[in-house]
C-alpha cells in the first residue's frame, strides 16, 4: 500500500492548513518559546466582563478574560433548553401545532414583548425559530408544555445535561434565562454551544437572519416576521455556524458564537456581562480581527519558510 511505503512531504503548505488549529493554539497561547522571546502578540481589548475564545475541536484556549467568573447567562439559557427539547422530546412532531396558553404566557413574565399570542397555535419548528432567533420568552415554555413536562422537571433535565457535560458551575431554574439563578461561566458555556451545534436543525435556525412563522386560529392563519438578534449574520467575512444573544438587567448583554474562520478552522466564543447592547458584537469584531491578523502573519512566515527551504 502506498501509505505504508511513501513518506509524506511535510514541507508543503497543505499540511500547515490541515494542522492550522493546532498551530494557531500554539502561536496565540504563547507556548512557542522562540516566538515569545522575539515578539509578544498584542491581545485584543475586551469590554465584556468575562470572555473566552476556544479553538475547536482541540479545545485550546486562545484568549480569556475572567472566564471562570460565575455570572447569569440570560437567554443563552435557551441553548440548553433547545438541547433538552431535542434530546428528551423526540416524540414531538416539529410540524405539529401547539396552542399558546396562559401558563406559557406566565412563564414569560418579566421578559420582552412576545409576538406569540395566547389561544393561537404555532408549529413546534416555528416555536424553535421564535426562541432561538428572536429569543421570544413564550416559545420555550410552549415547547416544554408540548413535551409533557412541568417547569421543575424541565429545569432538572437542563441541570442533568449540565452535569453530563461536566459543568460544575452551571445551573438553571427555568428555560428562558429570565432568572438570575440561571448561571454559568464563559469557559463552561462554550461546551453548551458546542453541544447545541450537534443538531443541524438548531444550526440552520441560528444561521437564519430573517424568517416568517405562521399563527393559526379557527382555520385562519397569520404570518409573523421573525428577525434574528445576532447582528453579525450576513456580515462580510463572518461565517456563523451557531450563535445566541441574551440580556437581562442583571446579566447585562451576553453573546456566544461558533464561528468558522477563512481557513475553515472553527472557534467558539462566549462574551458575558457587556454593558452596552453592541459591546458584545464589538468584542467579537476585535477578537475576529486579532485572529485574522495572527493567521495572516503565521501563513506569511510559513510560506517564506517553504520558499526558502527552511
Identify what each model region corresponds to.
Residues 39-49, 119, 124, 148-310:
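Penicillin-recognizing serine hydrolase domain
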Amino acid at each position: 500500500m502506498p501509505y505504508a511505503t511513501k513518506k509524506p512531504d511535510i514541507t508543503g503548505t497543505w499540511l500547515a492548513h490541515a494542522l492550522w488549529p493546532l498551530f494557531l493554539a500554539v502561536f496565540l497561547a504563547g507556548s512557542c518559546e522562540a516566538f515569545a522571546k522575539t515578539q509578544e502578540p498584542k491581545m485584543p481589548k475586551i469590554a465584556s466582563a468575562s470572555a473566552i475564545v476556544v479553538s475547536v475541536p482541540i479545545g485550546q484556549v486562545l484568549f480569556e478574560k475572567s472566564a471562570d467568573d460565575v455570572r447569569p447567562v440570560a437567554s443563552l439559557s435557551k441553548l440548553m433548553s433547545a438541547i433538552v427539547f431535542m434530546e428528551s422530546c423526540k416524540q414531538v412532531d416539529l410540524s405539529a401545532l401547539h396552542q399558546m396558553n396562559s401558563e406559557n404566557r406566565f412563564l414569560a413574565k418579566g421578559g420582552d414583548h412576545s409576538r406569540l399570542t395566547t389561544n393561537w397555535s404555532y408549529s413546534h419548528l416555528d416555536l424553535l425559530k421564535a426562541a432561538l432567533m428572536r429569543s421570544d420568552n413564550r416559545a420555550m415554555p410552549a415547547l416544554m408544555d408540548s413535551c409533557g413536562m412541568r417547569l421543575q422537571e424541565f429545569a432538572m433535565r437542563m441541570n442533568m445535561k449540565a452535569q453530563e457535560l461536566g459543568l460544575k458551575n452551571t445551573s438553571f431554574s427555568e428555560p428562558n434565562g429570565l432568572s438570575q439563578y440561571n448561571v454559568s461561566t464563559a469557559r463552561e458555556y462554550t461546551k453548551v454551544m458546542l453541544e447545541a451545534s450537534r443538531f443541524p436543525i438548531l444550526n440552520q435556525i441560528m444561521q437564519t437572519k430573517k424568517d416568517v412563522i405562521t399563527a393559526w386560529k379557527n382555520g385562519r392563519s397569520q404570518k409573523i416576521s421573525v428577525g434574528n438578534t445576532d447582528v453579525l449574520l450576513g456580515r462580510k467575512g463572518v461565517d456563523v455556524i451557531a450563535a445566541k444573544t441574551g440580556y437581562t438587567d442583571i446579566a447585562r448583554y451576553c453573546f456566544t458564537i461558533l464561528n468558522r474562520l477563512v481557513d475553515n478552522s472553527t472557534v467558539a466564543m462566549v462574551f458575558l456581562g457587556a454593558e452596552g447592547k453592541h459591546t458584545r458584537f464589538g468584542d467579537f469584531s476585535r477578537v475576529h480581527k486579532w485572529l485574522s491578523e495572527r493567521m495572516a502573519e503565521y501563513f506569511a512566515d510559513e510560506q517564506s519558510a517553504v520558499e526558502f527551504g527552511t
